[in-house]
Amino acid sequence: MDNIKFTPQDILHKQFKERNIGKGYDEADVDAFLDDVIKDYDTYNKELERLNDENERLRAKVDELNRQVEVGSSMSNQTASRQPVSSATNMDILKRLSNLERRVFGSQLDGNDNNDSHLL
């Protein structure tokens, strides 16, 4: 936007030189001014396109990040809901293993039950 030569007020208040009274404005002066106005509008249009492209890119990135947050949140909720079941399942497996060890090894474990209780 540094290449912009005129503000809307500059255009509104532009005074053209009169070449001869009654013959109108100096054509070269008017043409030069209009050339500068056209350049400004081209610069505005390019900047507007760039900003629109950037805006579209940033919106797409925000949408993608929101999807990632939703997926992460969903996975977190699933993990949290599975965790109590998993803990209960692990405890159940440990109890079964302990019962099987008692049955297989019989009295050998009964004497050492107090020493191995920290393993459960």
Curated annotation (Swiss-Prot):
Positions with biased composition (Polar residues): 71-90
Endpoints of the signal sequence: none
One GO CC annotation: cytoplasm
Disulfide bond positions: none
Pfam families with a match to the protein in the record: DivIVA
Coiled coil: 34-74
Subcellular location: Cytoplasm
Chain spans, region Disordered: 69-90
GO terms classed as biological process: cell division; regulation of cell shape
Keyword Transport recorded: no
Keywords, sorted A to Z: Cell cycle, Cell division, Cell shape, Coiled coil, Cytoplasm
Function according to Swiss-Prot or TrEMBL: Divisome component that associates with the complex late in its assembly, after the Z-ring is formed, and is dependent on DivIC and PBP2B for its recruitment to the divisome. Together with EzrA, is a key component of the system that regulates PBP1 localization during cell cycle progression. Its main role could be the removal of PBP1 from the cell pole after pole maturation is completed. Also contributes to the recruitment of PBP1 to the division complex. Not essential for septum formation.
Subunit record text: Forms polymers through the coiled coil domains. Interacts with PBP1, MreC and EzrA.
Record-stated family: Belongs to the GpsB family.
UniProt name for this protein: Cell cycle protein GpsB
Phylogenetic placement of the source organism: Bacteria, Bacillati, Bacillota, Bacilli, Lactobacillales
Gene designation: gpsB
